[in-house]
Every structure is written in C-alpha cells, then in structure tokens.
Amino acid sequence: MEGPEIKAVEAVIDNGSFGKRTLRFETGRLAQQADGAVAAYLDDDSMILSTTTAGSSPKENYDFFPLTVDVEEKMYAAGKIPGSFFRREGRPSSEAILACRIIDRPLRPLFPHTLRNEVQVVETVLAVNPDDAYDVIALNAASASTMISGLPFEGPVSGVRLALIDGQWVAFPRWSERERAVFEIVVAGRVVENGDVAIAMIEAGAGKNAWHLIYDEGQTKPDEEVVAGGLEAAKPFIKVICEAQDELKKIAAKETKEFQLFPEYTDELYARIDEIAHKDLDEALSIAEKLPRQDRIHEIKEHVREVLADEFTDMDDAEKDKELGNAFKELQRQIVRRRILTEDYRIDGRGLRDIRTLSAEVDIVPRVHGSALFQRGETQILGVTTLNMLKMEQQIDALSGPQSKRYMHNYEMPPYSTGETGRVGSPKRREIGHGALAEKALVPVLPSREEFPYAIRQVSEAIGSNGSTSMGSVCASTLSLLAAGVPLKAPVAGIAMGLVSGDVDGQHIFKTLTDILGAEDAFGDMDFKVAGTSEFITALQLDTKLDGIPADILAAALQQAKEARATILEVINECIDGPAEMSEFAPRIITTSVPVEKIGEVIGPKGKMINQIQEDTGAEIAIEDDGTVFISSEGGEAAKKAKSIIDSIANPHVPEAGETYNGKVVKTTSFGAFVNLTPGTDGLLHISQIRNLANGERIDAVEDVLREGDTVEVIVQGVDDRGKISLAIPGFEDQENNARPSRGDRDDRRGGRGRGDRDDRRGGRGRRSDRDDRDFDDRDDRPRRRRSDDFEDDYDDRPRRRRSDDRDFDRDDRDDDRPRRRRSADRDFDDRDDRDARDSRDDDRPRRRRSADRDDRGDRDDRRGGFRGGRGRGSDRNPRYATDDNYDDYRADREERTERPRRRVRRDFDPFED
C-alpha cells in the first residue's frame, strides 16, 4: 500500500571525545492537517512532534501578536502511568512551562509584530530517553515546523545546550554527563547575512556540583571570559542545525500565505501627537519616581486626546483611541532611546553604569525561620526562608532528569506591586520562570545534604516592582538564607542589564545599561540578567526584541554586570557577613545511622516502632535506604531523645540482673504485666511482685494496680537462657515469683495453647506437688500418694512396665488383687450405669467430677477470675465449697489437711486444658 511521502534531513553534532549526536527532522507522516508538522528525533531515541497552526482570521481588538506555545508531556513517552487520581495527564508541569518559555522567547521576535492571526505551536513529547532532556529538541522542532507552515516567519532559529565538562563544551549532553558539568548554557540564535550567528536567547547556570568541581577538583571557573567563550562555542552547532532546517524548507515548505497586517498607527497620527506632546513628554520622562511620572504621562495623554477629538474623523472612536495609544507609546519609546543613544541620559538621570539606591535588612518578619528585605530603587523584595526535614523535599514526576529537589524557590508578584488590581492565586508562567531563574542562581552555593540535612523553601515576594524583580529575588534570598542559618558557600547577587541600539550619525551603535528600570525594559532591546558570586557566574538569562545580538556585545555586557554585582555584594556583606544562629522556631535536625539490616527493626511492623518513637518524643524521623536517619524537632531536645532510642535499637543493650529501669507497661495479663525496658526489649513483672505495689495485699486483677501506659520502676531479677527477663519491684528482688515451675519443654504460654513447649507458665499455679501453700501433714492416716521423686527410689526394685510393643493386653493373670484398669478398647461408654456405679466410693471424699458433669467449666478463655489466675477458684473444683460464702472455710481446711501423695497423671494430660 502506498503511504505518504516522508521527507527528512539530519544535523550531525560532533562532540569530539564525547561522541556524536544526530538530530533528524522528518515531515509528511504525522499531523498532516496542521499547517506545519515536524517530528524531531535525537539519535532515533527521543521523539518530539511539533505542529504549527495559524487561525483563519485575525483577532479583533488585539493590539499584540497572539502567539501561544504549549508543551504536552505524555507520560507514556517515558513508560510511565500518570500519578494523578484519574491516571491521565493534567495541567502542565513546571518543566513543561519552562520549556514553553525557552521556545517562545526566540520565536516571537521573528514574526511580524503587527500580525493578529492567532498562531499556536504545540510540542508533543512522544518518546524520550531518560538520559536526555527534551526541551532543546522541542525548540528546534518548533522552528522547523514553523519554517514549513507557510507563515511569515523570519527563521530559522535553532538552539543548543552546551555543558562545560572537563574543560570541553559538549553539545546536547546527557543527564549522566551533566553531573560533572561546571556550567550549562542553552543558546538560541539565527544565521545573519554575513554568515555570523546572532544570539536570540540565553538560559544558563552553573552546575549543582560546580563548587566541588571548581574548588576541590580544580576545574575551570565559569567567569565572564569562560561564559563568553561558551557563546562562541555554540555558534557552529547553531549554524549546522539552521542549515538542516533550511534544507527541509526547500523540500517540504508550503508557499507563504498572505496575512493581513494591522499597523499600530498611521504616520499622520504619530506626527500630530509628536507635535502636540513631544516637549511635555520629554519633561515627564525625566521624573525619577515611577508613580508621579506615570501620573504626568497620563495627564499628557488625556490632553492629546482632547486636542485630537475633532481630528481624524474618518476613524471610529475605538480604532482612533487604540491607534492614539500605540502612537503615544511609540513617541515615549523614541524619546527615551534617543536620549540614551545621543546623551547617555536615562529616565531617572543616572549614567549608563549607575545602580539605584540599595538597602538590605534581615529578620523583619517574626517567628519565620529566616527573612530579609532587599530594595533597589523602587523594586522591593521580601524573602522568607523555611526549613524542614528532607522528607519534605519536592518530588518531581518528570519524564527525565532529577526526580526530586530539596531547594524550592517560589517567586510571587501580586498586582499591588505595580499599584494595580488583578488576579491573585496560582502562579503564572512568568512567575514560574522567574522563580526557576532565582533557584538556578543559588543552587551552586548551597551546602550539601550531608553538611545541611534540610529541605529549604525560599519564597520571594515582589512587593514593589520597577525593574528586575527576579534579580532582586536573588539578593533577598541570599540575605534570607543567611539569616535562617543556612551556611552558603558564598553570597550571590544579581543585576539586570539592558540594551539600546540604533543609528547615530550613520553608524549603528549599542548602549548597554546597568540596573534597568521597568520603562527601560519595555522601551529597550534586551533584558540580560546576570547573577553570581564575586568569582564566577551562577545564572544567566537573555531575552531580546531584536533578531539577534552580536556575541561581543554580550561579552561586554557580562563585564559591566560584574562591576555592578560587586557593588551589591558589598551591601549584602555589610548587612550580614555569614550564617546567623538558627531561629528558635526552626527545627533542629541531627543525623545518625543504623545498619541496613536494622532498618526494619527501627521502623517496626507497619511502622509501629518509628511511630511510637515519634509519639513519645515529639520528634520527626526520616530513614534513607542506606540507613541514614534524620531526626528533627524544635529546640533539639526531642531529637536527641529520639536519637538515643534509635541508637539503642541499632546497638541494643541487653539488660542485666540488678539494673533498674523506669519502664512503661505495654501489656497486662492475668499473671503479670509486661514492661518495656528499652526499645524492643520487654520484661515480665509477675503478679506476685505487683502485689508489693499494693502493700502486699491480694489483688484480683493486675489492672487494679497497673494499666497499659503506666510507668513503673523495676529491677531486673534475672534473664534466662532464652533471653526472657524477669522483673521485680526494687526492694523485693529477693522474693521468689510464685510461678508454676517447668513441666517439660513448654516454652512461652503467651502464644497458642500448644502442649509441647511449656517451660514458661508465667502466672500459672504450678504442679500439684509444688503448691507451697498446701500443708498435707494433718490429713488422715491414708497412705500418701507417691510423688514423682518416689519412683526414682524404688525404680530398680519394680518390674519394668511392659511397653505397648511387648506387653500382653490381657491382664487377667495379674498377681495383685487390684481390678484391672479398663482400656479404651473395652470401655462401653454407652453404659451409663457402670459409670454411676463408681460414685459409691468407700470414703467421704467428694468424688472427682468428670468432664461429663462439670457444668461450670464452660468457656475458659478469660481465666483471670480464677483463684491464682490459672485454674478457677478452689470452690469451683470442690463441691463442698461451691459457694463464695464458704471460701474462708475452704482456705482454713487446706491449712489443716495433711499432705497426700500426688495423683499420678500422664505427662501429656492436663485436666484443666480447654
């Protein structure tokens, strides 16, 4: 089957020892109904679909060019399912918004500014290698799709990311390679008529490991000369990609369509306004203060409107008012630019290199962890720092690159900062971009996680705006971070540079401005923001209204910015020269480490142990996979307490006899209470010891004296071979616990009711032969029943009892007069009369109740109500004392009875088992 005709071109990027990268543009297969559609591939591994579409008709009442750039991150591109509730993509991420800005800024100046048809560029990320960033690929794809769309576009423009790695500028570096980057720079530009590359956009910053690489490994410092060299290094790569786009245009571009352009004003209207208002505007544009200047300009505009009310009657009122506003604004622009180019005179009277009045102050907001106010002229920034546990660092659901960050910089500019009203709430693209730039400027000087184990949120509130609030945010953030006690490696300052270009006496000249005002930003050709320490640059951003700026002009602007940066750093150092003491309201975080195999013990089943530690101490605990533990609390005392508990779990101390503890009751039973001595270590305080807390009086239940959660002072009475700990009340440690001794290998009864492992019968009554409170000496003359120790004395004198495999079960030939013991084989359990015959006993002893007529046994799950907590009250076992009224008689009778031999019972038979 015949398919669509696919056309493709390639651009090969040679990085020398770092290998080659191939950027391929393909069109004809996808999105065939868009005006322009290009699929861009990087090494056939990452794929971006770019489409450019224009509206069929111009937008009415628009006085600007309506260009929209959108980036659609598809999670399937990285083999992921979206983490949202509905499991589908939603609002764009911050990374997508920053990519939109990188694309929009170099594209917008290349369209006619009088075009009013809406143009939309959509970048869809279809596939991405986790080791590659997609933003620069999308920038090149956007230019390519616009080039073939038939729109009036003065392209191509192309972009490249360079990273300074081991002294070499590497194009399209991978994320793994960027770990060793001292500096990264994204440069976009276009080839001009003389074959040179004019730079249209810059976004740059030092690497997050730059400080270590520079000062510990001796790598190249990204100062002004090095960064200028990076701009030059980008030109060959930009030229190669632009040539590929030109080739694609030749083979696949549509014919350029005719679009209606809307001039902002007529030449006649501009000349008339210049005649009326030039002198007044010239004076008004010399007023230094922003608001008085704006008020005076508004008065002049109203005067012009009144004068022209009866003129230009061929235009309707709305059209006339719009053109009047555009022409009036253009007149202001020309006055400001002319004075700068010819007189080196600026609006507020400063020279080209002068900085406005500076002021800095810290600790102006109570209770917050750190705060500062930085003011430059009428630009005023409030910086606020918040510290917290590392578990509060931001998790990023990105297609590639870092998945978390511990330093988060949020920039906010409310409408009142310019004396206006407007929407407040969620951040706009501009606010996200400014916050990212300020964040980029400060990341290289932050302490490492090991040096300062905190998540840091920095908020910059632009509460007054008249030029370069983003660079003011960098200065305010430095002050605020130091005030919060963050040990920055060096203070950082930022400055915004401007540019005005034009022809003077037949020569095209450029004038660079330091610390631009808002009006100079609006009327100038460039907004060039530079941030850094006293020794190197940490962040750069360039936006321009020109088609491009020569690299040598930018290099000179970098040197001019360095002078201004040094002046601002002096003011910062005078205000605060180092990290202050941390606020009393800031959490104190201490660290410890546990062996990886002990992490489970610290956390406990379902987090029980770690939650208990946090509840008991009030500290917050976070454990990393390598066993590093971060503990946080206000004031630090709770954190120290939690650390000691965690250390005791990781390196447990086994309690020894004689040691005293203030333990917490964690469980009560019928035979005693379990007391927690150290995390994960409990001991048993027997009920006989608990009586000592009640002045030795008898207690019916442990809960009458101790309850779960109570604290009790105990002493370790002993530790058996299996690590079971017996506790006592101090002063009574020599008192023996009245616990039932071992009956074979019976282990701990606290679990199931198994009968094979019963060494520890805590809380039971012991075996019959060992019940100390029975006195059998005063009984009648009946021969005592032999106990187990009697059998040892005459064992050798008795005939060996035949085992089941060699004895004759017919015992009719026995040599004694005892009736033979009936075997289960010949018992007729249906004959109830034979059983009743046994009730006619020849003594006065009450017959032993059989299981058939023991009505009171019932459900024995709760055995705490019985006498001595194990087998029911004696009155329940002897019908003679069946009522509670006779209980005292029962006790007295027991004291008078003589010892009788223990009745032999098979070892595996317990008549009181359920």
Swiss-Prot record:
Q: Which residues bind Mg(2+)?
A: D521, D527
| InterPro entries for the chain | ExoRNase_PH_dom1, ExoRNase_PH_dom2_sf, GPSI/PNP, KH_dom, KH_dom_type_1, KH_dom_type_1_sf, NA-bd_OB-fold, PNPase
Under catalytic activity, the entry for this protein gives: RNA(n+1) + phosphate = RNA(n) + a ribonucleoside 5'-diphosphate
Region Disordered: start and end of each range?
407-427, 727-914
Q: Name the residue ranges with Basic and acidic residues bias.
A: 742-789, 797-865, 873-899
- Describe the family membership recorded for this protein in Swiss-Prot or TrEMBL: Belongs to the polyribonucleotide nucleotidyltransferase family.
* Domain spans labelled S1 motif: 658-730
Q: Which GO terms describe its cellular component?
A: cytosol
Q: What SMART domains would the database entry show? A: KH, S1
Q: Which NCBIfam families match?
A: polynuc_phos, pppGpp_PNP, PRK11824.1
**A GO biological-process term:** mRNA catabolic process
Broad class of the protein's primary localization: cytoplasm
Sorted alphabetically, the keyword list is: Cytoplasm, Magnesium, Metal-binding, Nucleotidyltransferase, RNA-binding, Transferase
Q: Which residues cross the membrane?
A: none
EC no. given is 2.7.7.8
The job of this chain, per UniProt, is described as:
Involved in mRNA degradation. Catalyzes the phosphorolysis of single-stranded polyribonucleotides processively in the 3'- to 5'-direction.
What cofactor does this one take? Mg(2+)
Q: Specify the domain of life of the species encoding this protein.
A: Bacteria
Question: Cross-referenced PANTHER family, in alphabetical order?
Answer: POLYRIBONUCLEOTIDE NUCLEOTIDYLTRANSFERASE, POLYRIBONUCLEOTIDE NUCLEOTIDYLTRANSFERASE 1, MITOCHONDRIAL
Any idea which GO molecular function terms this record carries? 3'-5'-RNA exonuclease activity; magnesium ion binding; polyribonucleotide nucleotidyltransferase activity; RNA binding
Start and end of every KH domain? 587-646
Q: What is this protein called?
A: Polyribonucleotide nucleotidyltransferase
The record's subcellular locations are:
Cytoplasm
